[in-house]
């Protein structure tokens, strides 16, 4: 029986970008058309990747804006982040840049495990942010970029699988930097 590894992931983004819908679709396998603003919810799910099992603890946050102060609970003990914007809102994309900077400053690390998600891809006729813009931003951070649709269950599983992989990648890269070589 494989060892179950605990991973805490915080989902951040501007309001009404679909953070709750992504988490709910991933954990419950369903999409809710109704919208109640989130204060803060948590979800848990066991995810198997290869031979490894992960207890994924998701923190679904209330919408942030560029002036939001991120509480320490969004930084301390957190392994990775899913930063979500809506492809139908340029403002939500701009807020994501500010949130990433706050995370980066809060962690004091050069690398923070992040998956950048352009959600609501099913609403392409209303698109304000092109996929190439999201990809370029993610590349500048050294992060992964994905577009999704919580409504159509497009890549919801892949987002959270990818954040687990990003956490491992960043943890392994720090481990390599700290190795001592005796000669």
From Swiss-Prot:
Effect noted on mutating residue 54 to A = Partially deficient in guanine nucleotide binding
The record's listing under PROSITE patterns reads: RAS (PS51421)
Note the superkingdom of the native organism: Eukaryota
- Tell where it localizes: Endomembrane system; Cytoplasm
Offer a single GO CC term for the protein.
Answer: endomembrane system
* InterPro entries in UniProt: P-loop_NTPase, Small_GTP-bd, Small_GTPase, Small_GTPase_Ras-type
Q: Which GO terms describe its biological process?
A: positive regulation of NF-kappaB transcription factor activity; small GTPase-mediated signal transduction; TOR signaling
Q: What keywords would UniProt list here?
A: Cytoplasm, GTP-binding, Hydrolase, Lipoprotein, Magnesium, Membrane, Metal-binding, Methylation, Nucleotide-binding, Prenylation
Enzyme Commission code: 3.6.5.-
**Example GO molecular function:** GTPase activity
Give the recorded effect for residue 60 to K.
Significant decrease in NF-kappa B activation
Q: Where does Mg(2+) bind?
A: 38
Residue numbers bearing the Cysteine methyl ester modification: 180
**Record text on subunit structure and interactions:** Interacts with MTOR.
Q: What does this protein do?
A: Binds GTP and exhibits intrinsic GTPase activity. May activate NF-kappa-B-mediated gene transcription. Promotes signal transduction through MTOR, activates RPS6KB1, and is a downstream target of the small GTPase-activating proteins TSC1 and TSC2.
UniProt-recorded name of the protein: GTPase RhebL1
Record organism:
Homo sapiens
The gene behind this protein is: RHEBL1
């Amino acid at each position: 029986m494989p060892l179950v590894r605990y991973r805490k992931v915080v989902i951040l983004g501007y309001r009404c970008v679909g953070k709750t819908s992504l988490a709910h679709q991933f954990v419950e396998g369903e999409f809710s058309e109704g919208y109640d603003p989130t204060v803060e919810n948590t979800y848990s799910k066991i995810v198997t990747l290869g031979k490894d099992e992960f207890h994924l603890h998701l923190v679904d946050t209330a919408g942030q804006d560029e002036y939001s102060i991120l509480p320490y609970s969004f930084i301390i003990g957190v392994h990775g982040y899913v930063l979500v914007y809506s492809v139908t809102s340029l403002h939500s994309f701009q807020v994501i840049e500010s949130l990433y900077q706050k995370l980066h400053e809060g962690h004091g690390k050069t690398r923070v495990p992040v998956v950048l998600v352009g959600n609501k891809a099913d609403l392409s006729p209303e698109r304000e942010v092109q996929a190439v813009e999201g990809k370029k931003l993610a590349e500048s951070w050294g992060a992964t970029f994905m577009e999704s649709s919580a409504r159509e269950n497009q890549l919801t599983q892949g987002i959270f699988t990818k954040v687990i992989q990003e956490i491992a990648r960043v943890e392994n890269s720090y481990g390599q930097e700290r190795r001592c070589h005796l000669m």
